[in-house]
Amino acid sequence: MSIPATSTLIRTSSLELRSIRFEEVAAILDLIRRAIERGCSQHYDPGQRNAVFLTYARGLFAEAVGPFEGIVAVREDALVGFAQFDPITGRLRAVFVDGDAQQSGVGSRLLAEIERRLRLRGGKRLYGAMSLNAVQFYARAGFRSLSGPECLASAGVSVPVVRMEKLLRS
């Protein structure tokens, strides 16, 4: 997996943001599973949560050959967040924060880093299909809804999402 030129290490307080390393894939998958189980249980049934996990797991491995770029958030040597996006189109694929680190600014910092990287490349917008449990988080970060809840197929299971976007300022 190549590390892009924009993989500058960002470290403030005790949080470090950087591009993912291949040896972290198992830890990232574990973080994604925990975040889905904790954060999505009010909006999605177990089958839907498993389908979402499988979709993100496949996407993480596809990053090695596909267009997506991944960022991890590390605090005190522990992986506490993960984000994945397409640096060409601005499609946001994922932002996951470990349960104990939720509500501590990790997700906001990951989004800010994605926006920084997109702006460096001339990106004008960040968009994606957001899970129902995360709509308020994205709205607070300046995203607007493009649709009401709609269902997407995720690993063969129908999962409701809301399409959202944020226009980036230069």
Q: PLM features: residue spans?
A:
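Conserved active-site tyrosine of GNAT-family acetyltransferases
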Residues: 138, 143
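Conserved short alpha-helix immediately C-terminal to the canonical SAM/SAH-binding motif I
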Residues: 110, 134-137
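Terminal substrate-recognition subdomain of acyl/acetyltransferases
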Residues: 2-10, 156-170
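Glycine-rich phosphate-binding loop
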Residues: 105
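Acetyl-CoA-dependent GNAT
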Residues: 3, 10, 19-23, 30-100, ...
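Extreme N-terminal starter segment of soluble prokaryotic enzymes
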Residues: 15-16
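Conserved GNAT acetyl-CoA-binding A-motif
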Residues: 118-131
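Conserved catalytic-core motifs of GNAT/GCN5-like acyltransferases
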Residues: 127-129, 144-163
